[in-house]
Curated annotation (Swiss-Prot):
This is Nudix hydrolase 17, mitochondrial. Its main location: mitochondrion. Its cofactor is Mg(2+); Mn(2+). It comes from Arabidopsis thaliana. Residues 1-26 form a transit peptide.
Length: 182
């Protein structure tokens, strides 16, 4: 008899434990990606990325949310992918940092984005009833993504993955277990 993974099905809420830098809320997110399988079951060079719907369902984006005081930036990025997209994987070296204007709050935020090489897609996840998740090729995702700064993060990832110097084994990665996020 196998042991199944237990997933905390509640997302963190509230802003009281959020990190700020010079008055700007710090948010972290990931561009979850995987290499597409060919018809014969082999891994191809084609990359797919996972986008999610906003909670109101009107826009597509990459998972992101507040960076809290009790976690590293990589843990926050991994937690957001679990909560919003229901995926686990290896958080890789930061893609960049962007200052952007929040459409809903009218204030500037600081966004840090990471690539996540997805290793597992869960059937149940905390925000499954308020978000859709869709795997797309890079071109489709770039067109569909609402936020300019997330499109730029996607461009950085594509450039990094297409670089002949790209050596995934040497890339700094961090895997976070589900237990540390609940």
């Amino acid at each position: 008899m196998g042991v199944e993974k237990m997933v905390c099905l509640a997302s963190r809420t509230g802003r009281q434990f959020q990190r700020y830098n010079k008055g700007r809320r710090q948010v972290v997110g990931c561009v979850p990606y995987r290499f597409k399988l060919s018809n014969d079951g082999k891994i191809s060079d084609e990359v797919e990325v996972l986008v999610i719907s906003s909670q109101k369902g009107h826009a597509l984006m990459f998972p992101k949310g507040g960076w809290e005081l009790d976690e590293s930036v990589e843990e926050a990025a991994s937690r957001e992918c679990l909560e919003e997209a229901g995926v686990l994987g290896n958080v890789e070296h930061q893609l960049g940092k962007w200052d952007f204007l929040s459409k809903s709050r009218g204030t500037y935020y600081e966004g840090l984005m990471f690539p996540m090489l997805v290793t597992e897609q869960l059937e149940l996840w905390p925000e499954q009833h308020v978000r859709q998740r869709i795997w797309m090729n890079v071109t489709e995702a770039r067109e569909a993504c609402r936020d300019w700064w997330m499109k730029e993060a996607l461009d950085v990832l594509v450039e990094r993955l297409s670089s002949p110097m790209n050596q995934p084994k040497e890339e700094k990665t961090m895997s976070i277990s589900i237990e540390t996020m609940c």
